[in-house]
């Protein structure tokens, strides 16, 4: 399957915010909430895409003619390439009805494990999202990184305890999600974390 075929297939079942553009640069989906594009000024995604383009891989032809080794080691574990799958949550809200979070995480974690890399899994207001991610990670030897939103401390501890049962490679928190609308106005408060709170989490 070519990249163009992947995009054409995606356009039949993705949306309404992601357009499966030929060039995924955040311009068409900018300032959509919810959605994959950056909120506010809508430049975060665009700037990230521009920065990626500054990184180039140059072919070296003055070397031994052998298989290129793209592997690297992180925290004592070796992976096939220095790239991991990013965490995505609320699949149907952002990307259409084809996959819910449970089905998506099951496919993603298994595929990444088979490819020799890690899958970061998402989080959301539905507790089943993290529960499903934990199940997928456990079924694949903990080959992934569950990513928890910056909830209140009690909820964070509950979710950490849940995902630790799957013995994941690591656990992450996308603290920049503090600006998401669904975290605003919660009781107890969710969102930004003080240095002291971060010390408790780490």
Model-derived segments and spans:
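Conserved active-site and cofactor/substrate-binding residues in soluble primary-metabolism enzymes
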Residues: 39-47, 103, 107, 154, ...
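Metal-dependent C-N hydrolase catalytic cores
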Residues: 77-96, 100, 104-105, 115
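Active-site mouth loops of central-metabolism enzymes
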Residues: 88-101, 145-154, 185-189
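Short alpha-helical segments and helix-capping/turn motifs at coil-helix boundaries
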Residues: 67-72, 106, 131, 155-161
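An N-cap/entry alpha-helix motif that binds or orients negatively charged groups
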Residues: 2-80
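Alpha/beta enzyme core
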Residues: 110, 138-139, 151-202
């Amino acid at each position: 399957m070519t990249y163009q075929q992947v995009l054409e297939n995606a356009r039949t079942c993705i949306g309404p915010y992601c357009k499966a553009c030929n060039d995924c640069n955040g311009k068409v989906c900018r300032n959509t909430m919810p959605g994959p594009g950056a909120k506010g000024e809508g430049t975060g995604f665009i700037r990230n895409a521009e920065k990626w383009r500054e990184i180039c891989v140059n072919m070296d032809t003055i070397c031994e003619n052998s298989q290129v080794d793209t592997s690297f080691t992180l925290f004592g574990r070796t992976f096939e390439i220095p790239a991991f799958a990013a965490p995505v949550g609320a699949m149907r809200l952002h990307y259409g009805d084809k996959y819910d979070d449970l089905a998506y995480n099951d496919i993603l974690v298994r595929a990444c494990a088979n490819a020799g890399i890690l899958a970061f899994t998402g989080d959301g207001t539905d507790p089943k999202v993290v529960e499903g991610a934990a199940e997928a990670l456990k079924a694949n030897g903990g080959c992934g990184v569950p990513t928890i939103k910056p909830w209140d401390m009690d909820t964070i501890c509950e979710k950490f305890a849940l995902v630790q049962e799957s013995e994941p490679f690591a656990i992450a928190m996308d603290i920049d999600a503090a600006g998401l609308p669904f975290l605003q106005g919660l009781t107890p408060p969710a969102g930004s974390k003080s240095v002291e709170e971060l010390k408790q989490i780490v």
